[in-house]
């Protein structure tokens, strides 16, 4: 029956979901019911979640006696030692160029690099900068050092393999 309707249902579904992400992944049988959605500011699949999904909210955590700190759960958790372990001799340059240190002694991406998309666009513009090309994958990785993803409706989804992050 789907073919008889010229796959109209699929076309509508994909068009609707394109409002939420630039890339969609159909995954086996789940593709008939849910689509893996990667928000437009992200590049890597680990920063996506299924749509539709029942998102978590702050009360879901509070009801389980878990203090909810949106910044802690949804922003990369980057320590000085993590930067040194990843970037070795380039850690000083990376800190100065891409990060600001916050009041807790952790590092936040500067506004101009606070999404994977912004970071990738900057690196692609720096064609002569071999140093930037080498560190791109590590910087993208640091963007995924989170526990939760916040969706457009202010719901929260666990990051894939969040238990394997340093966060």
Specify the residue positions occupied by each region the protein language model found.
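Catalytic cores of glycan-processing enzymes that make or break glycosidic bonds
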Residues: 1-167
């Amino acid at each position: 029956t789907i073919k008889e309707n010229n796959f109209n249902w699929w076309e509508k579904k994909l068009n609707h979901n394109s409002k939420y992400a630039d890339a969609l992944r159909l995954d086996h049988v789940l593709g008939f019911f849910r689509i893996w959605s990667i928000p437009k500011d992200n590049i890597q699949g680990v920063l996506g979640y299924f749509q539709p999904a029942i998102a978590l909210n702050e009360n879901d955590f509070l009801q389980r006696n878990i203090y909810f700190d949106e910044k802690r759960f949804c922003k990369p958790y980057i320590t000085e030692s993590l930067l040194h372990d990843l970037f070795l001799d380039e850690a000083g340059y990376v800190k100065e160029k891409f990060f600001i240190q916050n009041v807790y002694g952790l590092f936040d991406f500067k506004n101009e690099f606070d999404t994977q998309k912004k970071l990738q666009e900057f690196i692609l513009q720096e064609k002569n900068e071999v140093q930037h090309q080498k560190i791109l994958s590590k910087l993208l990785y640091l963007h995924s050092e989170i526990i939760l993803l916040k969706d457009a409706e202010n719901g929260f989804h666990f990051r894939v393999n969040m238990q394997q992050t340093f966060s």
